[in-house]
Curated annotation (Swiss-Prot):
GO terms for biological process: translation. The keyword Acetylation does not apply. InterPro entries: Ribosomal_bL34, Ribosomal_bL34_CS. PANTHER family: LARGE RIBOSOMAL SUBUNIT PROTEIN BL34M, MITOCHONDRIAL RIBOSOMAL PROTEIN 34 FAMILY MEMBER. GO terms for molecular function: structural constituent of ribosome. Pfam families: Ribosomal_L34. This is Large ribosomal subunit protein bL34.
């Protein structure tokens, strides 16, 4: 049986990445809240998603 979470770095970055957040008013609100709260990572883009080390 196939489970719900089928990880893909590209999909993750496109849906939850910085540029995706900046593209909508709601996303910008998310970023400002996370800045205000002092989150170490604002978005998943800060995880070096597509990078091969």
């Amino acid at each position: 049986m196939k489970r719900n979470y089928q990880p893909s770095r590209v999909k993750r970055a496109r849906t939850h990445g910085f540029r995706a957040r900046m593209a909508t008013a709601g996303g910008r609100k998310v970023l400002s809240r996370r800045r205000k709260k002092g989150r170490y990572k604002l978005t998943v883009s800060n995880e070096k998603l597509g990078k091969k080390y």
